[in-house]
Amino acid sequence: MRADLSTIQQTLTPEAAAALARAMDEAGRRRHGQTTPLHVAAALLAAPAGLLRQACARAASAAGVGGGGGAAAGAGAGAHPLHCRALELCFSVALDRLPAAAAAAAAAHGAGASPPVSNALVAALKRAQAQQRRGCPEAAQQPLLAVKVELEQLVLSILDDPSVSRVMREASFSSAAVKSIIEQSLSAPSPCPSAAASTTTAGPGPLSPSPSPLPRAGAANAYLNPRLAAAAAVASGGGGGGGDDARKVIDVMLKPTRRNPVLVGDAGPDAVLKEAIRRIPTAGFPALAGAKVLPLEAELAKLAGDKAAMAARIGDLGAVVERLLGEHGGVVLDLGDLKWLVDGPAAAASEGGKAAVAEMGRLLRRFGRAGVWAVCTAACTTYLRCKVYHPGMEAEWDLHAVPIARGGAPIAAAAAGSALRPGGSGILNSSMGMLSPALRPMPVTPTALRWPPPGSDQSPAAKPAMCLLCKGSYERELAKLEAEQTDKPASRPEAAKPGLPHWLQLSNDQNKAKEQELKLKRSKDELERKWRETCARIHSACPMAPALSVPLATFTPRPPVEPKLGVARGAAVPTLKMNPSWEKPSVAPTLELRKSPPASPVKTDLVLCRLDPGTNPAVENEQKESCEGLTALQKAKIAGISDIESFKRLLKGLTEKVSWQSDAASAIAAVVIQCRSGSGKRRNVGTRGDMWLLFVGPDQAGKRKMVNALSELMANTRPVVVNFGGDSRLGRVGNDGPNMGFWGKTALDRVTEAVRQNPFSVIVLEGIDQVDVVVHGKIKRAMETGRLPDSRGREVSLGNVIFVLTTNWVPEELKGSNVETLLRGEERMLESTSSSWQLELSIGDKQVKHRADWLCDDVRPAKLAKELSSSHGLSLDLNLAVGALDDTEGSHNSSDVSVEQEQEKGQLAVKRSTPAPGSDILELVDDAIVFRPVDFTPFRKTVTDCISAKFESVMGSSSSFRIDEDAVDWMVGSVWLTDEKIEDWAEKVLKPSIERLWHNVKHDSGRSIIRLTAVAAKALPRWGGGREGLPVAVTIAIDGM
């Protein structure tokens, strides 16, 4: 097979050989076992001005004229780019379905070799060669290897392949019609290639593809069906009004069906729509005379974040439209740019968005025949997203797409021109217009569009300067990087052997050298960017972008331990790092900074003292409010965040759900906003939309709640959880429960299915440290390439998915005496909460209990002291020393403060001896977040205070009660594991039970006490559902009640 390929390559012109080479590269990139005609067709279609793309555009244009009437005939001269885009997506899906090469076959062919050519492709190439010989009588007398196959014959032969025809039918294209158009373009007499042109020194063929439209031939063709022939005749006759886009809009509105125009284009649709609306009163058509234009874009854009409210507002438009119809006889709904419908990361696919589309469809169906029209505009990418997320929108809204190009030129010429220009903004110039990869994720925030791409040239003044220390470190790493690159064998290509012809020499040495140069340049840019950001973050001598308009003098002085794993690229051991700037903080005042003139060099010093009395109080209060809840180290970390408002909103939402892990919430918010703005870690392939976070440490409930909050805030949906071996005692989140559709599928199949269903979701991979070697390798490659294969080898692009990898691994240096106690308490809390238990109210003899050992002096209940000194009073028995005993004598600090005091003098090195996740995973994730052990003391105090308040509100201060230790433990565990509020439960469940008991028993004179205990019994249904929640009722253990 390889010998056949080398022979056939000699018979191809340079253009055809280049197309075949691109197809083989695509097959190799996708790790396919063979190069098929599908790869060649995809490579031919990817060229913006290629022959196949132009022919497909002409075929789509001819097919659409027949249903468009005379008004649309003028527009038929250039097909809409979305037609070819749909064909590209179909080819991409077909390539994704092809199986990947087996490991043994890949090793046999070699790492750098291209996949072999399939039998179907060899047959297509031989058909093209035979057709080339038959088409030129002079070529029939030449040797077989002397006949050079032109690109046109290669395209025609590829279109004859059954697999290519099937894919084109899926995209509503006819391969016979496309082939007929190409043959018509070749029907004009042209000189046959001479023998001299077929030598090895021949230049490009005379029939190279041209971006100009293909000429139409008047001769009939057997491949062209009568409908397409009639459509081509109408198009060749030319319909009037093709050059006036505003006239096209009015003509569409006068049609009996598909009468609501949507103007699609990357430049000019808004101006065309305004011109059409201006012409409506003076158009001279009775149907449009006196129609009232109702602008809705501004109102709908305000509701873009709340699709449910948008659907309700559209439903309320019925009364307004009915009133305007009675007054004016006609209404034109100006919907404006449709980006309000698909704006946001997950808004396009939400139920609210579908409801908005359905409500607008019902409104137009109700009044459509009575004189109501809808007009709107959309960019090409926006319209494509509308068609993807709302496939039935065109039919429900009765839309008719009107392509708009710059300057009124045909849309095909405008799209091709913008694709050929370096800065073109046409749809063919976007990243989604190429097949490698087939479908790149779209940016979801305007900030991502404004961020300069990696490797872009910037002026030295625009880049932050580095101090001498960081510059020296940067130069040392740069020299080491260049030395490693020089030592690689690929950087020293062998000299070509002059005795062999060019087609037998190694042709990939130059390509490898260019790839190495590009990779080295990207590595240098990334290294420089890393050191500039590091210097700007930890050294105050370098100014940063004014993301925070707050002087560092107002920052909180106490530095906490950074709650994330800072993995240095190329370091042998990943470490938990502290900011070195906290070792010797500066104490210089900032008065000189504020009084320095603008032209003087600015130096920001960290000040650990209060502002001078002369500071403006209003400015100081405003700064304190903006920095409330953030520590000094966190402010230093987020100093480079461009979208500070989004960071604050995300941090607030995460902290409200998991208040005891505020440091982890701050680190998560910072890395998410940085990645969404384009400054995340680039894993060898440039900036991508997917994100990888690693949650390490204990507190499984905190991780689960953090993931829930992150998914609701970023994707407006529940997270998808795939368990690779996590703790089964915790209730599942997201949709990880039993599902009939998941039977027979592996865990990776579930991940790929979730990505296909929603490319903007949050996916949790629990127990990532327990996966096998195969799954570990696939996840690692997904981090590097942005594509994840399923069990059948079909790859899926990761889109804008946020992946959260969780593990219970705890760094060795966090395992101190106090931390070990907290970990044991968390384990016991999980075991007790997962068991069957019930709360019970009873009356017993009053006994003086010793004070709970876990209570500190400052939180000892006053009512307990009252009971010890008098027979009447409030008795609170809380013997809860087991879960949170502080082994440090005289220490009553929380876990965070204790850990900080133990770790302030050095770094927390993560040793390889611990069962840590793989070092490759640590180096590839965007960030690794450390969750600290949970200190349940604040939880217990909150629960006991709330329960005490309910008892006292019913019984008053003259009676005694006691809460059992196990009861408090179980209630604390339920509050920790669920989202339930203890205050709501105590008011609606516990208080009625206390009132019932108190009003139905005799009140003894202080000799009896009411007790709230936890008993092991068959558990009642839980408050709010689940199995870890608080009980829906509290039983009363008294006879007759």
Curated annotation (Swiss-Prot):
Q: Where is the composition biased (Basic and acidic residues)?
A: 482-495
Q: Name one GO molecular function term.
A: ATP binding
Q: Does the keyword Oxidoreductase apply?
A: no
Question: What positions does the domain Clp R occupy?
Answer: 8-188
Positions of the region Repeat 2?
A: 117-188
Keywords attached to this Swiss-Prot or TrEMBL record, sorted alphabetically, are: Repeat, Stress response, Transcription, Transcription regulation
Extent of Polar residues compositional bias: 891-900
Q: Where are the annotated segments for Repeat 1?
A: 12-98
Its function?
Answer: May act downstream of MAX2 to negatively regulate karrikins/strigolactone responses. Acts probably specifically in the karrikin pathway. May function in a transcriptional corepressor complex.
PANTHER family per UniProt: CHAPERONE PROTEIN CLPD, CHLOROPLASTIC (PTHR43572), PROTEIN SUPPRESSOR OF MAX2 1 (PTHR43572:SF13)
The record's similarity note reads: Belongs to the ClpA/ClpB family.
**Under what name is this protein listed?**
Protein SMAX1-like
Q: Which gene encodes it?
A: SMAX1L
